[in-house]
Design a protein with these regions (language model features):
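Sequence-level detector for tyrosine residue identity
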Residues: 37, 45-49, 67, 97, ...
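Sec-dependent N-terminal signal peptides
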Residues: 6-8
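C-terminal motif of bacterial Sec signal peptides marking the signal peptidase cleavage site
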Residues: 12-15
Length: 183
């Protein structure tokens, strides 16, 4: 009798709809991924971690998305976000940056889902103001150049399953100063 109860309990547990039994959500997008960004919000957080490094974030929007007066995103398109870009300057200097988790100069953080909060480097696919898909990037680089046409950003990013994503931005780089509370 104990064996029957044990087997029934095991069958019950295995058949439950738990995260263990659900297939993982793929990290590669199923929707079109825009790769040319037309609007940007550059944010400066100062020496946010008290590590003698300036911390920045870049929020990029593809055509179809826009910021409202409070910098909330609306519309349909792609939003590429990079947080925790580390430099020793008061702005993001020209050069090559690598995705890293060490918080060294000329690096930026990989995408992470930390207890339900998405941070680091990620892509949101937005349709009619609703997030349809999230892509976390695990490795890659960013090249920054300044020209007569403004700031030029070139991204070579990879997901956990090695899916490649190339994106660019060319335009102004106006910085907003943010506090620790506003991150």
């Amino acid at each position: 009798m104990k064996h029957i109860v044990f087997i029934l309990l095991l069958v019950f547990l295995v058949s439950c709809d738990s995260p263990i039994n659900r297939p993982p959500i793929p990290n590669t997008p199923t929707l079109k991924m825009d790769s040319i960004y037309t609007a940007a919000d550059f944010r400066s957080y100062g020496d946010y971690y008290n590590a003698n490094l300036q911390v920045f974030a870049i929020d990029l929007l593809s055509e179809g998305l826009a910021y409202d007066s409070t910098f909330h995103i609306s519309g349909s398109g792609c939003n590429l976000f990079l947080s925790d870009i580390f430099t020793t300057c008061d702005s993001i200097p020209a050069g090559h940056y690598e995705m890293d988790s060490t918080a060294k100069k000329m690096t930026f953080l990989r995408g992470m889902n930390f207890e339900g909060n998405i941070t680091g480097t990620y892509l949101l696919q937005i349709s009619e103001d609703n997030i349809q898909h999230i892509v976390l990037f695990q490795s890659g680089s960013m090249d920054v150049k300044y020209t007569d046409q403004g700031t030029h950003l070139d991204f070579k990013l990879y997901t956990a399953d090695s899916t490649y994503y190339h994106a660019t931005y060319q335009g102004p780089s106006k910085y907003r100063i943010k506090s620790r509370k506003e991150k």
